[in-house]
């Protein structure tokens, strides 16, 4: 029998809990610990914290990250924040513990253009300790970037890449509905965008990944964020959005050439009550 992969779950929020339950189903993975600073979760059994039907698992949730990392995990599944700057200390500690990392941090999905100094620091640390790390997820990490690149593989050359993603956020968890500003007035939404609070994180990273992977000469990456205004009252399990309030985000990322030509166009509409959720990719070339 092959040796099982020893894994630690770093962050036991809604996403981390779902990941932990999925890992529990994998015969090749052994969960040896978890990390979370929340006093309501720390020092408890992971299976009980995530509400697993087969709990307890005999797996401790540590408040002290280093104590968990000292267990010598093969891999740390990391899901604590969207901001690369905020999680640098966490990631570097995992690398120093000689554990590989799979992270849901959106800005880690392709940080080479948007955070070149942080990317270089992580790359150097990973090489020093002989491990690897990757940022991934559904979006960024797949639908609006890697899938675009994969579909382009059947072409000789791509001259322009476009993707449109429409998501009905009413079926998503409450943290996401809050992150996209659902239920705010339009003025509140714009103020929160200006403060950097309201946005889908990772769209510039997706633009950069597509541009570099398809060898498109993108010089400038731009991003616009506008409210998707509700045309009728929409109620979700968690919030109610009145007509005229922000229902979510309408976000566009563009990759422009030196002369201003649009080479990459990624549009995301993520709002509660979306009528026709879909993903559309358009590639121009030959």
Question: Where do the protein language model's features map onto the residues?
Answer:
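Conserved active-site and cofactor/substrate-binding residues in soluble primary-metabolism enzymes
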Residues: 10, 14, 18, 71, ...
């Amino acid at each position: 029998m092959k040796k099982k992969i020893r894994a630690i779950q770093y962050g036991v929020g809604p996403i981390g809990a779902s990941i932990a339950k999925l890992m529990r189903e994998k015969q090749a993975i052994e969960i040896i610990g978890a990390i979370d600073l929340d006093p309501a979760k720390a020092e408890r059994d992971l299976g009980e914290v995530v509400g697993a039907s087969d709990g307890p698992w005999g797996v401790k949730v540590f408040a002290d990250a280093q104590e968990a990392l000292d267990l010598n995990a093969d891999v740390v599944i990391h899901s604590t924040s969207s901001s690369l700057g905020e999680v640098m200390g966490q990631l570097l500690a995992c690398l120093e513990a000689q554990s590989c990392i799979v992270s849901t941090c959106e800005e880690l999905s392709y940080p080479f253009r948007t955070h070149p100094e942080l990317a270089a620091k992580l790359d150097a640390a990973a090489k020093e300790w002989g491990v690897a790390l990757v940022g991934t997820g559904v979006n960024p990490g797949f639908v609006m970037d890697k899938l675009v690149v994969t579909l382009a593989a059947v072409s000789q050359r791509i001259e322009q890449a476009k993707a449109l993603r429409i998501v009905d956020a009413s079926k998503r968890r409450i943290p996401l509905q809050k992150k996209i500003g659902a239920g705010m007035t339009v003025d509140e939404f714009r103020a929160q965008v200006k403060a950097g609070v309201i946005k889908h994180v990772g769209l510039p990273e997706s633009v950069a990944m597509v541009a570099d992977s398809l060898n498109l000469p993108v010089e400038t990456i731009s991003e616009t964020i506008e409210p998707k205004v509700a045309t009728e009252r929409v109620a979700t399990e968690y919030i109610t959005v009145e007509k005229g309030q922000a229902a979510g985000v309408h976000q566009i990322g563009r990759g422009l050439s030196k002369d201003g030509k649009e080479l990459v166009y990624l549009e995301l509409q993520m709002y509660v009550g979306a009528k026709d959720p879909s993903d559309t990719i358009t590639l121009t070339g030959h």
